[in-house]
Amino acid sequence: MDSSYWDAKFDTDDYIYTTVVNRFVKEYCEPLIAKQTQGKMIDLAGGEGRNAIWFSEQGWQSENIDWSKKALSKSLKLAEERGVADLHFAHIADATGFESVLTPVDIGVVAYLQVPQQDLADALDTLVDNVRPGGHILGVWHARENLADGYGGPRDEAVLPSVASLTEICADLPVEIEVLTNRDGQVQTKDGLKPSITVVLLARRL
């Protein structure tokens, strides 16, 4: 899979992942924002920008880093529509190796970057490098357990992290884990809500 796949996927007027902030991003980051009315954040592999734009609506500078030009174009458009274009930045880069225009940031978010463990480790390593000491990293993924017990998400175990695999990755990073747990993500379908197992990581940069 390369950027052309994602460009084709995002090549629609609709926002395929909606324009509403992910509920786990909101739940875990709202208390952090409350302690710091102005800040900077990176949304790694942020797609169409729903999470980054939400941060900018709270008065934060946000940077959406993604490798799909189509997604980033929609992210910038959404920022304009929401009146936060002056607070939102977008640039194309690979998640495993990027340079941020806002570094060092206060919060680094990575939501649903479903890639093999080594690629995920490289992406988190780069993200952590761009977060200031005392800042936070929030990760949200379809969990490995979702393959057997949940609805939606990838059907490939290799791109589904677990609490154990994320613990292993974090052991090599300058972070302190504050939350690492499976949550019920729940997927809205035409037949109602379906159970979906989501793994959430909140860590403080040392």
Indicate residue ranges for each PLM-predicted region:
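Conserved class I S-adenosyl-L-methionine
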Residues: M1-Q36, Q38-G47, E145
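Conserved SAM/SAH-binding beta-strand->alpha-helix loop
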Residues: S68-K70
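Conserved SAM-binding loop
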Residues: S75-L76
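Conserved SAM-binding strand-loop segment of SAM-dependent methyltransferases
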Residues: G83-A95
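A short SAM/SAH-binding and catalytic strip from SAM-dependent methyltransferases
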Residues: D106-L120
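A short glycine-rich, Lys/Arg-flanked "PGG" loop and its adjoining helix->strand segment in the class I
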Residues: A121-P133
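Conserved beta-strand signature within the Rossmann-like core of class I S-adenosyl-L-methionine
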Residues: G134-H142
